């Protein structure tokens, strides 16, 4: 298992193979990830705790509660946020960890 600290919280990568990656993401309250898309990467997330805000390209928001899932296809613009309290999610994806195109970022990352 490998922990990766992020400005919005951290990731615990618990599985990493040539075919898939499994991560647990902890998003601190009041933080959000970049508005982004992936050219190749496909991912499914499962909410463990907290209310996850999922933003799309048009700014629409979907709120997900513990036990709910969300699938992200390649080229689908998305952003995850923890607006009300800290959020923990499980993410299972294809192994393309560096496949991130950031459109907006609260922390100045490109």
Predicted feature locations:
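A short glycine-rich, His/Asp/Glu-containing loop-to-beta-strand
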Residues: 1-41
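Double-stranded beta-helix
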Residues: 2-6, 79-110
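Structural motif
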Residues: 32, 44, 51, 77, ...
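Short acidic-glycine-tyrosine-enriched beta hairpin
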Residues: 58-77
């Amino acid at each position: 298992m490998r922990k990766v600290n992020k400005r919005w919280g951290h990731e615990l990568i618990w599985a990493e193979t040539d075919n898939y990656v499994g991560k647990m993401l902890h998003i601190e309250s009041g933080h959000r990830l970049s508005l982004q898309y992936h050219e190749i990467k496909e991912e499914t997330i499962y909410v463990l705790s907290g209310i996850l805000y999922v933003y799309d390209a048009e700014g629409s928001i979907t709120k997900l509660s513990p036990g709910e899932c969300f699938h992200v296809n390649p080229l689908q613009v998305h952003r995850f946020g923890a607006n009300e309290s800290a959020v923990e999610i499980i993410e299972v994806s294809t192994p393309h960890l560096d496949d991130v195109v950031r459109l907006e970022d609260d922390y100045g990352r490109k």
